[in-house]
Amino acid sequence: CAASCAPGMGDAPEVNGRRYFGSLALPAGQVFRFALGSEPELRDPGIMSGQSDGRFARMLFEGLTTADERTLEPRPGQAYRWETSRDGLVYTFHLRPSLVWADGTPLTARDFLYSWRRVLDPAAASRNASLLYAIRGAEDYNKGVAQDALALGLAAPDDSTFVVTLANPTAYFLFLTNYYTFMPVPRHVVEAWGQRWTLPKHLVGNGAFRW
């Protein structure tokens, strides 16, 4: 009678159409704890590359898009909509209104502009900088062939609009914008604390959780 005699079987709630036997009650203090498997090597989404690093980043940061939980298709994240030019080269992202960092500082398109340029800066030594090579001028800038960050195909014409120009049409580009390397970092915190900005007492994200 394993099924019929299981305690609380009839009271189990349904989650996404399936009966769930865990607890749906919020933990005390709304603190979420989970196992990473290993300690993150790095906590800077623009620099990191490890699996545990990425899981950590997804808890604290959010990019322009997210992934549909069933299809993995791009869905709105920090950008609530976007347009693509007819030639597939220009992506215009429109950020959600009133976005803020976890410390209450406004988050704007200029944060994405700063963050993506930072990933491509050779001095940052980002392990995943090549993921941005689809962007016009990105590879030459990252490899030191070109020196002018203003020549990159990145622009923030106003606080809520972020424009990306690609070197060539890239069908999977929207999928990339959900990857942690493309997530924004808080310029005001990075510049205030340098490499120490990812310490627990300094780290500020824009995602669902605070650390």
Regions found by a protein language model. Name each.
Residues C1-A3:
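Sec-dependent bacterial lipoprotein signal peptides
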Residues A6-M9:
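Bacterial signal peptide processing site
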Residues F21-R33, G205:
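Immediate post-signal peptide segment of exported/extracytoplasmic ligand-binding proteins
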Residues A35-R86, H94, H202-F209:
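N-terminal lobe/hinge region of extracytoplasmic solute-binding protein
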Residues F61, T65-E69, V100, R117-A125, ...:
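Sec-exported extracytoplasmic/periplasmic mature domains
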Residues E69, A138, D148-A151, S160, ...:
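Gly/Pro-rich hinge or "lid" segments in bacterial periplasmic/extracellular proteins
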Residues R81-L131, V163:
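Aromatic- and charge-enriched surface segment that lines or borders ligand/interaction sites
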Residues R86, A156-D158:
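Residue-level recognition of beta-strand termini and adjacent short loop/turns
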